[in-house]
Amino acid sequence: MLPLLDSVSLPYLILSACLSVILLRRFLAHDKGGSKSIAQGCLPEPRLRQWDPIFGFGIVISQARALRGHRYLEWLRDLHASMPHTKTFSANYGGYRWIFSIEPEILKAVYATNLQNFGVEPIRQHPPGFQPFAHKGVSTSDGDDWSFSRTLIKPFFERSVYISTDRIKPFADKFMTLLPDDGETFDIQPLLQRWFLDITSEFIFGKSQDSMTHADRAEVTWAMADVLRGGRQRAQTHRILWAFNWDWWFEAVEKVHGFLNPYIRSTLKELEERQQRIKDGLPVDEERTDLLWSMATMLPDEEELRSQVCLIFVPNNDTTSMFIGHCLYFLARNSNAWKRLRDEVDAVGDAPITFEMLRNMKYLNGILNETHRLIPNNVTQVRAALSDVVLPLGGGPNGKAPLDVRKGDIVSVTKTVMYRDPEQWGPDANEYRPERWDGMRGGWHFLPYGGGPRRCPAQMMVQNESAYMLFRLAQKYSTIVARDPEPFRARMRIGPSSMHGVKIAFYK
């Protein structure tokens, strides 16, 4: 009978077997726990109409094209616009049940109420998307591994560290000397990235990269941008990685590792020598106070330490510089907002710039919040269900009934759409209005840094650094003008970065 399995019939046999496995998996997932969910009032959620409802590769390919074509934000908005009668719906995403939502209560459940039922390891660590860049770290681990990663970095994100403006000042002073003459058009985004690379390298490694003086030292920044851009693409298309050429991404990973390895190896060697001298009763120099040194004392394994450092240094180096660029993008297009910021800065006078002062500047903080709202660095909040759980909303035709979520399902809250929901923000939800934050209270409808125990540990540090830079720029320049007629188009990295840069001109 073996001759029957010829070159024509064999592919069909394989296809049939794969189809049977997928259908069996979906049947078992649907059948499991049905009576329990009915007892809790759960109803099935609306489902996205797909041309490929069995395998679910259509939406994966569509998303991959959007990412590579720099239309990801538009793709997300169009996806939700296609389901106008509900804030929550599901799709078959490469064989997984993927639940999309813009419901704040679902974000609350994932981050707080049902935190123990959700995690990130199944989507960030087990698929090969992020490897060989990094494996375990604070943003890829759950349970004890996550607790350990958090312990590694927590001392450096305490209040005594993030409130310091003295740490920022010398780098901001240098940055100001590099800005061009009045009226000259320039792209401020690369300069912001060099500025932040210098701050971050001193904070993490104890020694600044000094890329504002030596521009060639910023090359690792562009490699990190490629690592983040490719990492997102690989994580979201991990089931069809074979369909794309990733040579450019592996080259970027190699460059980043090549940058970090000397720091890590020299630190481990210095630590070993110090411990030996202490053991021998010999005098030692004063202990280093940078983050890498602190991490190395708790994790002296080179490969594991590099993974942890990668997942702090690379995303952290991108986030703040992009965010300040977004702030300036909007301010250059809203002269009244710049004037109001200038008025608030002028009212302070010559008082020293402190964390408390910046936190109390209402309009400045309105600018930060409004920028987070319109261009959130964290576009989606994605979690995998680690166990069966019932969410308070999302079921039924309008999404108002409880929703049964099974182990292995993916829940994705689309913040870039939720933050523009007219039901929450009013008819001007798409408009830039920093004043809307005057008197507005926070809540689960707006969490730029996440919430609950897993919120971003660098939240206050990012806010302080961003506010400080905007304060200094408003203090120096009377006018900011947009010199790029292009609308904002996002190139996705850790978050959306302006594809056309941030081309502006300043006037004193």
Curated annotation (Swiss-Prot):
The keyword Membrane applies. The gene is tenA. This is Cytochrome P450 monooxygenase tenA. Its cofactor is heme. It is a single-pass membrane protein. Induction: Expression is positively regulated by the cluster-specific transcription factor tenR and is induced during cocultures with the natural competitor fungus Metarhizium robertsii. One of its GO terms (cellular component) is membrane. Cytochrome P450 monooxygenase; part of the gene cluster that mediates the biosynthesis of tenellin-type 2-pyridones, iron-chelating compounds involved in iron stress tolerance, competition with the natural competitor fungus Metarhizium robertsii and insect hosts infection. TenA catalyzes an oxidative ring expansion of pretenellin A and 14-hydropretellenin A to form the 2-pyridone core, leading to the production of pretenellin B and pyridovericin, respectively. GO terms for molecular function: heme binding; iron ion binding; oxidoreductase activity, acting on paired donors, with incorporation or reduction of molecular oxygen, reduced flavin or flavoprotein as one donor, and incorporation of one atom of oxygen. Pathway: Secondary metabolite biosynthesis. Coiled coil: none annotated. Disruption phenotype: Fails to produce tenellin, and leads to the accumulation of 11-hydropretellenin A, 12-hydropretellenin A, 13-hydropretellenin A, 14-hydropretellenin A, 12-oxopretellenin A and prototellinin D. It is found in: Membrane. InterPro entries: Cyt_P450 (IPR001128), Cyt_P450_E_CYP52_ascomycetes (IPR002974), Cyt_P450_E_CYP52_fungi (IPR047146), Cyt_P450_sf (IPR036396). Keywords: Iron, Membrane, Metal-binding, Monooxygenase, Oxidoreductase, Transmembrane, Transmembrane helix. Its EC number is 1.-.-.-. Belongs to the cytochrome P450 family. It comes from Beauveria bassiana (White muscardine disease fungus). It is an enzyme of class 1 (oxidoreductase). It comes from the Eukaryota. It holds the Pfam family p450. Heme binds at residue 456. The chain crosses the membrane at residues 8-24.
